[in-house]
Amino acid sequence: MAGSNTIDLNPELLAAAAESKAWPFEEAKKIIERYKGGEFPETILFETGYGPSGLPHIGTFGEVARTSMVRHAFRVLTQDKVATKLLCFSDDMDGMRKIPDNVPDRAALEPHLHKPLSSVPNPFGGDYASFADHNNAMLCRFLDTFGFDYEFASATQYYKSGRFDAMLLRAAERYDKIMAVMLPTLGPERQATYSPFLPISPKSGRVLYVPMKHVDAKAGTITFDDEGTETTLSITGGRVKLQWKPDFGMRWAALGVDFEMFGKDHQTNAVVYDRICNILGGRAPEHFVYELFLDENGQKISKSKGNGLTIDEWLTYAPTESLGLYMYQRPRQAKKLYFDVIPRAVDEYYTFLGAYPRQDWKERLGNPVWHMHDGNPPAIDMPVPFSLLLNLVSASNAQNKDVLWGFISRHTQGVTPKTHPELDQLVGHAIRYFDDFVRPTKTFRAADEVEREALEALDAALGALPADAGGEAIQNASLNVARKIERYQDHSKQSPEGGPGVSGAFFQMIYQVLIGQERGPRFGSFAALYGVAETRALIQQALAGQLA
């Protein structure tokens, strides 16, 4: 999905970027403001987090895609004079709190509960040493597939290599200050046992949630009870990790993170992360809080519930770019992430792409495709919308691409799978989407007397048109039929002749009776693509009671 690494810095673009209100520019301007009056650091660090207790999912894609858009906007605003890096950080030292549902041989993982994910055996087979190693590899493969420019980081490696040692020692020195931030956020029971330090048990290898008996900042050790045995442990070298809220702030301070976005579920904790970062001598990064996705019933999507849409499912029915567009649009608005949003996202993507060459720079920088493709959107001609392909599959009962291409090639001269490979890909997506989501819900209904008369009149009107009539001619003929029928007259609209306009109920009736669906694209466009003769045959089938 990512575009070229070369950035266009022409003067018109730069002037438009300085004024742009597109959200990636708004976020990038915050980072620039952060260093106003001073020098930028050697590298501006963008970070995203990953919890390897599960495989990478659609939220992972969204976070990396959106952060990449902000990073690109920053590069443009600074004329690419400041180095940037996107760090994808895996929290693979977290304890395995529960066994995921989607792993083979769950019982074999029971003895490893609460061990760091990087110490849990890999249940998937292959060459990966641990559960986290496998999922981290899946993350990198996932990000590489989409062409993201990033650097992977492992919490286990950072802790064990000593990258966090200085901050851990500072956390011991400032233990009381950290506790003063954390305790008010906890209930009375948790307050009594809470510690920001989580030792890895030398006995069991588990991540221990135990109270501290003593924190020795000078020696850099903590003392606690491990299954009844008083134990003193060095806090450096990966023997101890921090609880997740202090860990967030510590990481920001240790690495000098400049920008991190997270879901709304983190919003109340952001102030805690910031304060911990400040206590440890760091400067909290700029935040961007995005809204969470909802399922078809408006419920929050949960990995454990599996009530959302996986990235593989989306990409079964639509190109990657449609998902990129969905991530760009309205990130601060709760949106439904379910199968029925896919067709619109596909058509909107190609509409934005088609508009791009005609736009000036101000409009281009407000066009999602500029952000999705790092300022270099491809030139793709998409002569048939996805929604129209779906109706064509529905009317023709096509089971393979060849049938659909028969209609497309007849309607649009010179368009073939070779000349338009993106359309060919979309044809395959449309067949799969129709088979899985439209066909099972298709319900034809019989026409009543008024509707039968309307369909007979429509059949006659189509019969008066040439066999190769275009969409506009068919649409006008259809409207002329509807204007003469009282049920379909809309007196709030006006026809070109000054009479009443046409109610949307007319075209809804056509789709319900002929296609078995509640709605569809512009009827004239559909009939032109399907064919005048074929559309008339469909009307005759409906009138003969062969559909309902």
From Swiss-Prot:
<feature type="short sequence motif" description="'HIGH' region">
    <location>
        <begin position="52"/>
        <end position="60"/>
    </location>
</feature>
<keyword id="KW-0067">ATP-binding</keyword>
<keyword id="KW-0963">Cytoplasm</keyword>
<dbReference type="GO" id="GO:0005737">
    <property type="term" value="C:cytoplasm"/>
</dbReference>
<dbReference type="GO" id="GO:0005524">
    <property type="term" value="F:ATP binding"/>
</dbReference>
<keyword id="KW-0030">Aminoacyl-tRNA synthetase</keyword>
<dbReference type="Pfam" id="PF01921">
    <property type="entry name" value="tRNA-synt_1f"/>
</dbReference>
<protein>
    <recommendedName>
        <fullName>Lysine--tRNA ligase</fullName>
        <ecNumber>6.1.1.6</ecNumber>
    </recommendedName>
</protein>
<dbReference type="InterPro" id="IPR020751">
    <property type="entry name" value="aa-tRNA-synth_I_codon-bd_sub2"/>
</dbReference>
<dbReference type="InterPro" id="IPR008925">
    <property type="entry name" value="aa_tRNA-synth_I_cd-bd_sf"/>
</dbReference>
<dbReference type="InterPro" id="IPR002904">
    <property type="entry name" value="Lys-tRNA-ligase"/>
</dbReference>
<dbReference type="InterPro" id="IPR001412">
    <property type="entry name" value="aa-tRNA-synth_I_CS"/>
</dbReference>
<keyword id="KW-0648">Protein biosynthesis</keyword>
<dbReference type="GO" id="GO:0006430">
    <property type="term" value="P:lysyl-tRNA aminoacylation"/>
</dbReference>
<comment type="similarity">
    <text>Belongs to the class-I aminoacyl-tRNA synthetase family.</text>
</comment>
<keyword id="KW-0547">Nucleotide-binding</keyword>
<dbReference type="GO" id="GO:0004824">
    <property type="term" value="F:lysine-tRNA ligase activity"/>
</dbReference>
<dbReference type="InterPro" id="IPR014729">
    <property type="entry name" value="Rossmann-like_a/b/a_fold"/>
</dbReference>
<feature type="binding site">
    <location>
        <position position="303"/>
    </location>
    <ligand>
        <name>ATP</name>
    </ligand>
</feature>
<feature type="short sequence motif" description="'KMSKS' region">
    <location>
        <begin position="300"/>
        <end position="304"/>
    </location>
</feature>
<dbReference type="GO" id="GO:0000049">
    <property type="term" value="F:tRNA binding"/>
</dbReference>
<keyword id="KW-0436">Ligase</keyword>
